[in-house]
Amino acid sequence: GSVIDGCNMENASYGLSICAERVALFTAISQGKRPIELAVSCIDAKGDAAPGSRMPCGACRQVMLELLPSKADVSIDGVGRRQLEQLLPTPFELRQPTIN
């Protein structure tokens, strides 16, 4: 397999920042690396940091669910492996309204 790096880019306007998980995922897709079967999230946190502080943010979870298989493994540094669908069991879904 391939290792695709990503880095967190922040600026004064947090809404314009992007997380490393999304950078790596978008880079992999732009390079034609499909299908992607494993995602890895490494958060720079102190050894005694709570597991929740090491988890991918909600935006990254949503993007991963839209671009990866729901059964894909996500390896989270300091936490372990989880299936993607466990990280976001009820994702946002944009569906066309049903017309009766």
Stretch-by-stretch model annotation:
Residues 6-7, 69:
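Generic, low-specificity signal for short hydrophobic/alpha-helical stretches with a mild N-terminal bias
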Residues 7-23:
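Compact, glycine-rich, soluble single-domain proteins
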Residues 17, 21, 27-36:
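Active-site- and interface-proximal helix/loop "cap" or "latch" segments in soluble metabolic
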Residues 31-100:
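C-terminal binding/interaction regions
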